[in-house]
Regions:
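Gly/Gly-Pro-rich "capping" loops immediately C-terminal to redox-active cysteine motifs
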Residues: 38-66
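N-terminal signal peptide c-region/cleavage motif recognized by signal peptidases
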Residues: 17-20
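Hydrophobic helical h-region of N-terminal Sec-dependent signal peptides
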Residues: 9-14
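Axial heme c-ligation environment in periplasmic c-type cytochrome domains
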Residues: 45-46, 66-93, 98-102
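The canonical Cys-X-X-Cys-His
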Residues: 32-39, 94, 98
Length: 103
């Protein structure tokens, strides 16, 4: 019985952690990325624009992570969108959010 409750509590913890993680990605997007990606500033692919994201997504997640983390030469996209205080994990979570919205 004890192992049953441990399993239940672990599952609840994962659900809560996932919800918190998603909210954090959304908040990070709003505070650090939306200024360019909501309006398409300097040809930034807009959030949810499937046509704009399709060729980028074909390059794979690693390429998108690299662009977000290190910047993309020849574009306005600088490393971490200019927010050097963001952790790599935070940036990757926002990339994952943006990919999900473009599917």
């Amino acid at each position: 019985m004890k192992s049953f409750w441990i399993g239940v509590l672990s599952s609840v913890g994962l659900i809560v952690a996932s919800s918190t993680f998603a909210a954090t990605a959304e908040e990070t997007y709003k505070s650090s990325c939306a200024a360019c990606h909501d309006a398409g500033v300097a040809n930034a692919p807009k959030l949810g624009d499937k046509a704009a994201w399709a060729p980028r997504m074909k390059q794979g997640e690693d390429a998108l992570y690299t662009s977000a983390l290190k910047g993309k030469p020849g574009t306005a996209m600088v490393a971490k969108g200019g927010f050097a205080n963001l952790s790599d994990a935070e940036v990757k979570s926002v990339v994952d959010l943006m990919i999900a919205k473009a599917k």
